[in-house]
Regions:
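Short, well-ordered alpha-helical segments
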Residues: 209-225
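Short, well-ordered beta-strand elements within core beta-sheets of diverse protein domains
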Residues: 56-60, 149-150, 205-213
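Short beta-strand/turn micro-motifs at beta-sheet edges
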Residues: 44-46, 136-138, 191-198
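Short, glycine-/Ser/Thr-/acidic-enriched flexible segments
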Residues: 95-99, 106-109, 152-156, 192, ...
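Internal nucleotide-binding/catalytic subdomain
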Residues: 1-116
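Short beta-strand-to-loop capping motifs
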Residues: 12, 23-25, 151-153, 211-213
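Active-site "cap" helix and flanking loop/linker of ATP-utilizing ligase/carboxylase catalytic domains
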Residues: 69-88, 105-182
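Generic long, charged, amphipathic alpha-helical segments
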Residues: 165-208
Length: 225
């Protein structure tokens, strides 16, 4: 194993809730509101199945809160010094004893950005241009919660050398119960041939389906219907 993993880090396990807080940064300050999100990493609902990079996320927009003040906000001087512009979040384990930061993500998250677009009511090009220009503005967002669910096929779990599985799902058609209503559908490895949606590529990641609601149950129901 020393050849495959020459260096590894042993970390102390902390039991708690995994939660991330993120915000867009214009080079000088954070753009409000902030984003609080909870990733779902196992392949099936109910924490069933193997771990994936991410199968979906629940999120909401908020004014700066304790989690933000104790973690991400402390990075402001370093972000200003580096001239950073973009999205940044920090993932943490939170329990009754405190907040334990895990890692930073200094880029758009996937499928985080698709789910955020469900909750942001401003045109995407408008707020991205303002952000890149270093403007100070407030994001217009929906109240309540947004949920995103990633739709995959089994090629997500195989190596590129597994030709049998890859061929099994190559170019398969993708059908919708309501083909005239595609709100909340964010495509990934999908192509259109002769008017039909089909599986493209070998990543196994087809699309992200998003929904929103004043409660988590409402947002989840919109995604699945």
């Amino acid at each position: 194993w020393t050849k495959k993993v020459p260096v590894f880090q042993l970390q102390k396990f902390v039991s708690g809730v995994e939660v991330a807080v993120g915000a867009f940064f214009n080079g000088k300050d954070f753009i409000l509101p902030i984003n609080v999100n909870f990733e779902h990493k196992r392949v099936f609902p109910g924490d069933i199945g193997p771990f994936t990079g991410e199968m979906g996320t629940l999120m909401f927009w908020s004014e700066p809160n304790r989690l933000f003040h104790m973690t991400l906000e402390k990075m402001k001087p370093a972000l200003v010094e580096s001239g950073y512009i973009g999205y940044i979040d920090i993932n943490c384990i939170v329990n009754g004893k405190g907040i334990y930061p895990l890692e930073f993500t200094a880029r758009f998250g996937y499928p985080t950005i698709q789910i955020q677009s469900e909750g942001i009511t401003m045109p995407m090009g408008e707020w991205l241009y303002k952000l890149a220009s270093g403007e100070n503005f407030e994001l217009k967002t929906k109240k309540g919660f947004q949920v995103g669910v990633r739709i995959n096929v089994p090629t997500l779990f195989v190596k590129s050398t597994d030709k049998e599985t890859i061929e099994m799902y190559r170019d398969l058609p993708i059908l919708f119960k309501k083909p005239d209503s595609l709100d909340g559908i964010h495509i990934e490895d999908v192509k259109i041939e002769d008017g039909s949606w089909r599986v493209a590529g070998v990543s196994g990641c087809l699309m992200v389906v998003t929904g929103s609601g004043t409660t988590v149950s409402e947002a989840r129901q919109q995604v699945y219907t």
